[in-house]
């Protein structure tokens, strides 16, 4: 049957082998990992136990990402994988799984911030003109600015580079989607330090 998710092959705590009392069972079967890469969308449907269907994403290029402090979600392009706590090989091959840290395009979030508050964050492209808002819209923006949470310094720097860090919260090999949330605050600091450590370890 191939891959099996049983525990009969495991040894005892003392190191002895368990006697085999039965063969592999259909309900214990496992499948090859999806190893989702960055590229044009390619999702396959897999029939699973009970006649249910799973979506196995083999390639994805974008996903929905939530900006927690602003309560805003947008579709954004996935650029590359930068950190994976479990396996460096998945970073090298740009393979993304649940919990890995990726870089995404900052443009949708920068546009939202500009439209919502009238404040431009991040780098400007050559030829970009100041968009003029109507008086009514400008008044709304002023009111929003009064209750606005101050922007985290770490995320401000990332907006300047045009790339944001995000964590994948969905399971691309099970749901066929790569959705997640932006890293900010203490979590962003933690992963920035972890990435620096891995870079230094790689150089030495």
UniProtKB/Swiss-Prot annotation:
GO terms for biological process: translation. InterPro entries: Ribosomal_eS8 (IPR001047), Ribosomal_protein_eS8_euk (IPR042563), Ribosomal_Se8/biogenesis_NSA2 (IPR022309). GO terms for molecular function: structural constituent of ribosome. GO terms for cellular component: ribonucleoprotein complex; ribosome. It comes from the Eukaryota. Pfam families: Ribosomal_S8e. Keywords: Ribonucleoprotein, Ribosomal protein. Belongs to the eukaryotic ribosomal protein eS8 family. This is Small ribosomal subunit protein eS8. It comes from Griffithsia japonica (Red alga). The lineage of its organism: Eukaryota, Rhodophyta, Florideophyceae, Rhodymeniophycidae, Ceramiales.
